[in-house]
């Protein structure tokens, strides 16, 4: 009986951890300063306009908001968490060709990482762009 209650306690803790991740919001700013706001099952893309770009020419396209499946959302969040936790690809300051990933939870706890080009960053951008195509 004691093991049963221990098992139930573990399940409750794990389910709360899952809920914590769902309540996280992420913002990804790519190397061109296009912004991707990622919240529960939604990606909101806010591109930079030519008038805002350093070149005065680059335009990130049209704004778009999409709903993503739970599977896609979970995949995006899992990779975002890996990137935030493993700061191997972190740069100390924002320079050309870097991107920034931010996270904020429901208690307003914030984390961020400045990213140099890497395979994980490329994969993360690919997941976001694929989600926006749907």
Feature map (PLM): residue ranges:
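Short, well-ordered, aromatic-rich surface patches in folded extracellular/luminal domains
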Residues: 18-28, 93-134
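Short amphipathic beta-strand/extended segments with alternating polar/hydrophobic composition
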Residues: 37-41, 59-61, 65-68, 108-118
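Mature extracytoplasmic domains of secretory-pathway proteins
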Residues: 54-90
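A short, structured beta-strand/loop element
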Residues: 41-52, 95-98
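C-terminal motif of bacterial Sec signal peptides marking the signal peptidase cleavage site
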Residues: 14-16
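Positively charged n-region of N-terminal signal peptides that target proteins for export
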Residues: 1-4
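Bacterial N-terminal signal peptides
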Residues: 6-12
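Post-signal peptide N-terminal segment of mature Sec-exported envelope proteins
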Residues: 25-44
């Amino acid at each position: 009986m004691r093991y049963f209650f221990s098992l139930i306690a573990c399940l409750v803790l794990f389910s709360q951890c899952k809920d914590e991740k769902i309540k996280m919001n992420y913002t990804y700013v790519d190397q061109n300063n296009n912004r991707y706001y990622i919240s529960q099952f939604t990606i909101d893309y806010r591109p930079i306009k030519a008038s805002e770009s350093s070149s005065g020419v680059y335009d990130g396209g049209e704004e778009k908001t999409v709903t993503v499946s739970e599977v896609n959302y979970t995949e995006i969040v899992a990779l975002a968490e890996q990137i935030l936790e493993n700061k191997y690809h972190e740069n100390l300051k924002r320079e050309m060709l870097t991107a920034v990933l931010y996270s904020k939870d429901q208690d307003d706890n914030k984390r961020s990482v400045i990213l140099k080009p890497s395979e994980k960053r490329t994969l993360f951008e690919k997941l976001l762009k694929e989600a926006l195509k749907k």
